[in-house]
Amino acid sequence: MNGDLEVDMSRGDFNPSFFLGKLKDDEFESRSLSDDSFDAMSGDEDKQEQRPKKKKRKTKYHRHTSYQIQELESFFKECPHPNEKQRLELGKKLTLESKQIKFWFQNRRTQMKTQLERHENVILKQENEKLRLENSFLKESMRGSLCIDCGGAVIPGEVSFEQHQLRIENAKLKEELDRICALANRFIGGSISLEQPSNGGIGSQHLPIGHCVSGGTSLMFMDLAMEAMDELLKLAELETSLWSSKSEKGSMNHFPGSRETGLVLINSLALVETLMDTNKWAEMFECIVAVASTLEVISNGSDGSRNGSILLMQAEFQVMSPLVPIKQKKFLRYCKQHGDGLWAVVDVSYDINRGNENLKSYGGSKMFPSGCIIQDIGNGCSKVTWIEHSEYEESHTHSLYQPLLSSSVGLGATKWLATLQRQCESFTMLLSSEDHTGLSHAGTKSILKLAQRMKLNFYSGITASCIHKWEKLLAENVGQDTRILTRKSLEPSGIVLSAATSLWLPVTQQRLFEFLCDGKCRNQWDILSNGASMENTLLVPKGQQEGSCVSLLRAAGNDQNESSMLILQETWNDVSGALVVYAPVDIPSMNTVMSGGDSAYVALLPSGFSILPDGSSSSSDQFDTDGGLVNQESKGCLLTVGFQILVNSLPTAKLNVESVETVNNLIACTIHKIRAALRIPA
């Protein structure tokens, strides 16, 4: 019987952490009736012993057959915690009662825990013996130390003081070791491992930490990360709404929370690697993440994977409008594998338990447990459940955008998941063997890289992120909702002026997007068209949805030799919003780019539009018979208009008032033309 129950601790693949988390709930549930015959008892004796000894009845002992023990052991390896249905099925198979099955598994887990605790005690005893020997060596060394000047003992008299100090230090080390061992019971599958000591005994558990974060702080971060992971898993399993969209009474702080689930064209390992690599993460979510960096690696993943990895990160999160401040956050990111093809990545502010001083600063916010759960479903696809929950000062946001940020579309789960789906679809299309452009692979890659730089420059001019060193200008005759920025530029060389404003329009996002992308309607609002309609000379599709592409435009009906200018444009449209960004480029430069040349030397001054839902919860859109207008009671969309112009070719030149008035008039004129074309009253 004992031979069936012994665990070979000398095996190299023995993993005690597998059992530590599984055995927590069994600590007071059951005890073994006997070390030699725990699997031979039905469990009736435990109940009999707890009753008052008024009547003595002969206890029946039931010894399981070898076949029963073999089947129970086999099932235990697969599932140490069978549910009632599994116990009934197993009992029916082995002709045992469900209660007998239950007690057998309880006793089996209890004995496994006892064996594991015994080996933990061996580890601690070895560590204690090692510390004791080191202390003895230091004691002997100090006892024989002599002063260089006087030749006397360094510590006069008895060495009791030195012994006392060593005991204090030993106690501190022992306490720290106990804390790490306790943490190991929770940190299953992380970077804590059994390290083989120099004396050849069983290793002690250690924790690799960053160089800039102290050991105590790292343990605190790990505790916080694991609590956040538990909270994320609970939120993902809830079937009801997670949070109320309203602020607490009497508080200016807002607590938006959202959850969204969808399919993504990427496998779990690739997505986990993207999320845990700061540069890849910022590139994937470029319209949300302005800048990001990893401050410290708190814990590396185990076995060369990202499982158990904890990062201390900081990032700036943006909404495409000058009326919404950039949200700056410092947070922990923890990645954990919960099964084959099942991962979870959680973010949480590292100062979540502190006060709200950070919220008082402009753009300050706090991140509650947020992140995603990723599950492989085959064919290179994953099912992703995204959860977002944060806190910010509502008074810092313009009233026009407060409903949007309170919904899941502003910076909520819908925005993150839709962006992930769009980007993964784009990467999948670009990696496919089908050629829709007639360009070489190098040419396509070069033009897409140029379009990406154009987008990032446009985002920076709208949100004033730190990608470029923008300086804010306060000018007269400029509306309060219009932001004027300036910066020195190297390509093109000179002073660049950026102007952006946002407004609400009573048209649907789809209607406005189609109008702005229609080349035949371009002359109704774009001064670069010179009154002519525009046509595509090149189109690189980036998604299945119509309008998601990078294109080259030129005036229709004109010979290519008549004009040396083309317009590079990128557009996309999904449930989270839409984008139309463009920039004039010269033909020789684009010929070089389309041939696979370096696009970094092409000068760009992007302009364009960002379209966002207005965050209203009204019913379906209402169209009129002539052009897509909706009633004021129905939801419209939020339009952000942004222009960048070169006002002086000398980087050292001073900005004049006329330049500011020019770009301000350009924005006002463009908005007026769009309103007129869509028959929207001013």
Swiss-Prot record:
The UniProt keywords, alphabetically, are: Coiled coil, DNA-binding, Homeobox, Nucleus, Transcription, Transcription regulation
Query: Source organism's superkingdom?
Result: Eukaryota
List the Gene Ontology MF annotations in alphabetical order: DNA-binding transcription factor activity; lipid binding; sequence-specific DNA binding
Quote the cellular component terms of the Gene Ontology held in the record: nucleus
Q: Which organs or tissues contain this protein?
A: Expressed in cells around the base of leaf primordia, in the outermost 2 to 3 cell layers along the boundary between two leaf primordia. Expressed in lateral root primordia and tips, and in the epidermal boundaries of two cotyledons at heart-stage embryo.
The protein's matches in InterPro entries, at most eight in alphabetical order, are given as: GLABRA2/ANL2/PDF2/ATML1-like (IPR042160), HD (IPR001356), Homeodomain-like_sf (IPR009057), START-like_dom_sf (IPR023393), START_lipid-bd_dom (IPR002913)
Q: What is its main location?
A: nucleus
Q: What happens when the gene is disrupted?
A: In plants missing HDG3, HDG7, HDG11, PDF2 and ATML1, increased cell division leading to cell overproliferation.
Q: What CDD domains does this protein's entry cite?
A: homeodomain, START_ArGLABRA2_like
Q: What does this protein do?
A: Probable transcription factor that binds to the DNA sequence 5'-GCATTAAATGC-3'. Seems to promote cell differentiation.
Instruction: Family membership, please give it.
Output: Belongs to the HD-ZIP homeobox family. Class IV subfamily.
Q: What is this protein called?
A: Homeobox-leucine zipper protein HDG7
Question: What species is given as this protein's source?
Answer: Arabidopsis thaliana
Q: What is the lineage of its organism?
A: Eukaryota, Viridiplantae, Streptophyta, Embryophyta, Tracheophyta
